[in-house]
Amino acid sequence: MPENIEQTGLFGKYLSINKIFKDREVLRHSYRPHTLPHRKEQIDQLAAILAPSLQSETPSNILIYGKTGTGKTASVRYVGSELEAVSRKMKSYCQVIHINCDIIDTQYRVLTQIAKLLSDDNDEHPSDKARIQIPMTGLATDQIYSKMNEQFEHIGAAFIIVLDEIDKLVKKSGDDTLYTLTRINSDLTHSRVSIIGISNDLGFKTFLDPRVLSSLSEEELVFPPYNAPQLCDILEQRAEMGFNQHVLDEEVIPLCAALAAQEHGDARRALDLLRISGELADRERADKVTTDHVHKAQDKIETDSMTECIRTLPTQSKAVLFCMLILHKHGQKVFISGDITRVYRSLAPALHLDVLTSRRVSDLISELNMLGIINTRLVNRGRHGRTKEMWFDASIDRIWEGIHDDPNERFTAIPSEIVQDALTGGI
């Protein structure tokens, strides 16, 4: 607690003695625990596959699958850290290069980032660092590839390149990067490179050329979802480090685990629930974290994630959703695709958008259904044929909040008379 609490003004009451947390950082996804409960089998498999790198051999490439929060990245980082530590003791240098393809999602950026990390991260290697400066833009890809290979050869070691969220890279930029990296060893004499791809999406393999898939998936590992008892063990481990003694009601951790187990066994969701429950109790100046705090945390997470989902929708998807909101505001609780399409065609020009075809509007409606924002069903209307009925599955307030958070304010600036004209022609 600050010595002069009276000088902290607005924040004073929040900086007083913390009754709840001992170290809340251990409850975040970014924290790396020393042990990973219920992932020994996968860790042992990874170690067995990568062990040849310690004997001047090239390990197999690996594809790792599993839903969000199943310990894929944490396990790979753990094994990679152990591999580097053992290699230093054995003086058989190995380096693990971790690339987040959700951010670094083009071939140029991936190759550039690898080259940069090769230059920056070799303080402990006996050779001089290969200080080759590479701009983030401006060079041809083959030039970047050549410079990267220079650094591999300069260092002369075993390298494991981890492409986390590899599906994001493939879906945005195709499989050229993977084709290049899986064939890199034919251009190297003094170094060896292996690839680990991590994905939440089994379907991304359909985007790969068969030759790339064959090279990349020499070994495949699947990380199953955690069940509720396993999530309890994970939360108990973190809670012991993260919370003060006796502040958690005994039902809090089992409830967090049970709720997260329903979300495909997501350890990240379980940790978020536990941490946010503690934060809510802390803000209330409560002495204990209770199941009421867990339920409030669950509502908060679902609210925040849905608003963010809607806020980041493409503008045309927002426009279709906006048309549903207008219909709902004027009394319709269930919509049919024809009404939505007619209102959309009237409003799109006023929203400064190109008017999409009925088929494309229907596709966007299906995407909104997949995101859990709306529900849909096909109904038979007799001689009028079949049509799609829709209704909101998410909170109307959350949807409006996400729609209104548009950088161009197009959905708040549209004149009411234009909306009324669209409704008159659209119903």
Functional labels for PLM-detected ranges:
Residues M1-T58, E82-A85, G426-I427:
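A short, basic N-terminal segment
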Residues P2-K19, R28, P59, I103-Q113, ...:
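Mid-core helix/loop region of P-loop NTP-binding domains shared across ATPases and GTPases
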Residues N61-L63, V86-D102:
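Conserved catalytic segments around the Walker B and adjacent sensor/switch elements
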